[in-house]
Structure formats: C-alpha cells, structure tokens
C-alpha cells in the first residue's frame, strides 16, 4: 500500500466535534502541518470527514 501526505489548510474554529476528533486522530493540530499516514480504509474515512479542511497527496 502507498502512503498519504495529509496537510491541514484550514483551522478548526467552528468545526463540529467529530471533525476535531478526526483531525486529532490524524495527528494534525496546526494549519500547514503535514503528516504521512498509510493509505488504509480507516485513514481514508477520517480524511473523508475533514476533506474540506485538508489536502491529500499520494506519496510513494
């Protein structure tokens, strides 16, 4: 499986609690912070919840 580079590009002010929880689970706390996670269905599900707050790139 590949890897996903997930970058937060919007803040969490006014976000719903489940979106805040998803961001914390992904390991994102600050704007422009990036993390690399494995491309698994559970990570894809977390990204789907916060797709409007992050950008996702595939990394080899």
From Swiss-Prot:
The keyword Cell membrane does not apply. GO terms for molecular function: structural constituent of ribosome. Keywords: Ribonucleoprotein, Ribosomal protein. The keyword Ribonucleoprotein applies. GO terms for cellular component: cytosolic large ribosomal subunit. Pfam families: Ribosomal_L30 (PF00327). InterPro entries: Ribo_uL30_ferredoxin-like_sf, Ribosomal_uL30_bac-type, Ribosomal_uL30_CS, Ribosomal_uL30_ferredoxin-like. Belongs to the universal ribosomal protein uL30 family. This is Large ribosomal subunit protein uL30. It comes from Saccharopolyspora erythraea (strain ATCC 11635 / DSM 40517 / JCM 4748 / NBRC 13426 / NCIMB 8594 / NRRL 2338).
């Amino acid at each position: 499986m590949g890897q996903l580079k997930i970058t937060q590009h919007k803040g969490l002010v006014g976000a719903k609690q489940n979106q805040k929880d998803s961001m914390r689970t992904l390991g994102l706390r600050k704007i422009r912070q990036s993390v690399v996670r494995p491309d698994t269905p559970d990570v894809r599900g977390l990204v789907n919840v916060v797709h409007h707050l992050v950008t996702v790139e595939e990394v080899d």
